[in-house]
């Protein structure tokens, strides 16, 4: 029979890690998760996340609308200059110039909400990772028979994996919002006479506001679902095959 030799000192360190992890996890379930559920539920009820009129989220776009007559004259002068221009480097530098407007700021209302949301995303992913590791360390040696508790562990682990995937997607979604908004602002600045690009910026802000509320809700629900399913199945998760004492029939 193949065996792996483990130094007692190394095994002792692993045992300390396991005990510390179990203690942290039980503390999370006993006090931290209920606390976060309550905090996030209160956050969802704040006026900042319950704006009935989404047009109030509109951020000013400091992009002046050009005068058609002046723009036409400017375009004609530019064409004439390009014909006369022979220095390719100078022409390239001219093409790289930004739009003729000042800096366009982010939507401060959205940014403030995201500054509160991002630490919550980081926190729930870390806590979920901790609880997932705890669950994996409870999985017993693979044997035939009496595997109902192990099946319960597998089902809960599947739920945790699904939650982790969803929560990680929140970080990507936030980055995507800024990327898309930046593109929309750039288009609005480059073609200020096109009202659709201006409106697109506001539409993206409104959509992100609704996404923020949904993300807070999903984080709260993640804590609640984890707390509920682990509490209901705690014995099966911690001792999937029950007590090790022999059973008499």
From Swiss-Prot:
Compositionally biased residues, Basic and acidic residues: 68-98
Entry GO terms, CC: cytoplasm; nucleoplasm; proteasome activator complex
Residues of the signal peptide: none
Family annotation (Gene3D superfamilies): Proteasome activator pa28, C-terminal domain (1.20.120.180), Proteasome activator pa28, N-terminal domain (1.20.5.120)
Parts forming coiled coils: none
Protein induction: By interferon gamma.
Keywords in alphabetical order: Proteasome
Alphabetized GO MF terms: endopeptidase activator activity
InterPro entries in the cross-refs: PA28_C, PA28_C_sf, PA28_N_sf, Proteasome_activ_PA28, Proteasome_activ_PA28_N, Proteasome_activ_sf
The UniProt record lists the keyword Thylakoid: no
Segments for region (Disordered): 60-102
Domain of life: Eukaryota
Any one GO biological process: regulation of G1/S transition of mitotic cell cycle
Membership in a protein family: Belongs to the PA28 family.
Quaternary structure, from the entry: Heterodimer of PSME1 and PSME2, which forms a hexameric ring. PSME1 can form homoheptamers.
Biological function: Implicated in immunoproteasome assembly and required for efficient antigen processing. The PA28 activator complex enhances the generation of class I binding peptides by altering the cleavage pattern of the proteasome.
Annotated PANTHER family: PROTEASOME ACTIVATOR COMPLEX SUBUNIT 1, PROTEASOME REGULATOR PA28
Protein name per Swiss-Prot or TrEMBL: Proteasome activator complex subunit 1
């Amino acid at each position: 029979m193949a065996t792996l030799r483990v130094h007692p000192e190394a095994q002792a360190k692993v045992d300390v890690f396991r005990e510390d992890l179990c203690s942290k996890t039980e503390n999370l379930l006993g006090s931290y998760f209920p606390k976060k559920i309550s905090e996030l539920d209160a956050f969802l009820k704040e006026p900042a996340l319950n704006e009935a009129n989404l047009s109030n989220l509109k951020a000013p776009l400091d992009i002046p609308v050009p005068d058609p007559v002046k723009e036409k004259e400017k375009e004609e002068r530019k064409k004439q200059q390009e014909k006369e221009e022979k220095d390719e480097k100078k022409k390239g530098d001219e093409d790289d110039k930004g739009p003729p407007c000042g800096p366009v700021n982010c939507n401060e209302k959205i940014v403030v909400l995201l500054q509160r949301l991002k630490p919550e995303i980081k926190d729930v992913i870390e806590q979920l990772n901790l609880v997932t590791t705890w669950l994996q360390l409870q999985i017993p040696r693979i044997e035939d028979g009496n595997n109902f508790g192990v099946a319960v562990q597998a089902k809960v682990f599947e739920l945790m994996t699904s939650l982790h995937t969803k929560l990680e997607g929140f970080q990507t979604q936030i980055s995507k919002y800024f990327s898309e908004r930046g593109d929309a602002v750039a288009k609005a600045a480059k073609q200020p006479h096109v009202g659709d690009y201006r409106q697109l910026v506001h539409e993206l802000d409104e959509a992100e506001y609704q996404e923020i509320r949904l993300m807070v809700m999903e984080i709260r629900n993640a804590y609640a679902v984890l707390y509920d399913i682990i509490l209901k199945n705690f014995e099966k998760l911690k001792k999937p095959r029950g007590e090790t004492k022999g059973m008499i029939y």
